[in-house]
Swiss-Prot record:
Gene3D superfamilies: Phosphatidylinositol 3-kinase Catalytic Subunit, Chain A, domain 1 (3.10.20.90)
SUPFAM superfamilies, alphabetized: CAD & PB1 domains (SSF54277)
Main subcellular location: nucleus
InterPro entries reported in the protein's UniProt record: AUX/IAA_dom, AUX_IAA, PB1-like
Family: Belongs to the Aux/IAA family.
Motif (EAR-like (transcriptional repression)): 43-47
Species name: Oryza sativa subsp. japonica
Segments forming domain PB1: 177-281
Gene this chain is encoded by: IAA7
Induction, per UniProt: Not induced by auxin.
Keywords from the UniProt entry: Auxin signaling pathway, Nucleus, Repressor, Transcription, Transcription regulation
UniProt subunit comment: Homodimers and heterodimers.
Name by which UniProt lists this protein: Auxin-responsive protein IAA7
Amino acid sequence: MGEASESMKKISRGRLGGSWMGEPSDHHRHGDEQEEEEKTLELSLGLPGGGWRAACRDKGTTTKHSIAAAAAADDDDGDKSSMLSLGYSTLVSHSQGKANKNKGSPEEEEAHPPPATGNNALASNNNGCFQTRSPSTPVVGWPPVRTFRRNLATSSKASLELQNGKKAAKAEEIKRAPFIKINMDGVPIGRKIDLNAFDSYEKLSLAVDKLFRGLLAAQRDPLTAGAKDCQQEDVAISGLLDGTGEYTLVYEDYEGDKVLVGDVPWGMFVSSVKRLRVLKTSDLSSSLITSGRKRTAAEC
């Protein structure tokens, strides 16, 4: 009995030792799995998963074995790259065959152009955007015009327009206001006369005679005027146009020049006259009187 009990103890010890020494327990297995996972996830210059360096560390190989494993890995990579290049070449040849098969005659290509893809589509879109935006961009001359030059040009243009507007307004004023002031030497009061009521110089001279005959008589000496009242009423102011009488009719134009009435046609006279004056013939220059007499003789 004693020997049997000792043999049973040895068997149980062997089993316990075998289970502890020969086969690893669950706790040790779990620890090994964690270490492998950490080695797999650690950062390195190689591919994820540990690579040949992790395998060399686990197996305890020497440097020669690691170099041989690296060479083998490089050979595997070369085989893979050659296989990839071979697959790429077969794919390219297959795509070229399809393109040649789908390619038709030039008429069909013109009738059905291939759709633009990739860079061609992007280039066409950019060209379309450029064509649509180009008309909206302002055209700038060279050299550029400075601001003060533009202001000078606009101001000069505005001044010219203003001058033209003033001339047009003056012409309209002449047409709309035909009443002209008329003054006579020796008579302090002036009168106004409507030139549109006349159509010749003779009618104008008769109207001037009627306007100033009574006023001129009132300016004389009262005693002389009372003694010869009836005779003065019959005396008319004659020689206004040719300078042969006591008074001569002269007009002033818009330029400030004094001209004898009757030297220009009637229409020009009406458009250029600014003021009429009845001046004494003795105060006028001899050249004006001579030109007036020559004009009268030519008309006769």
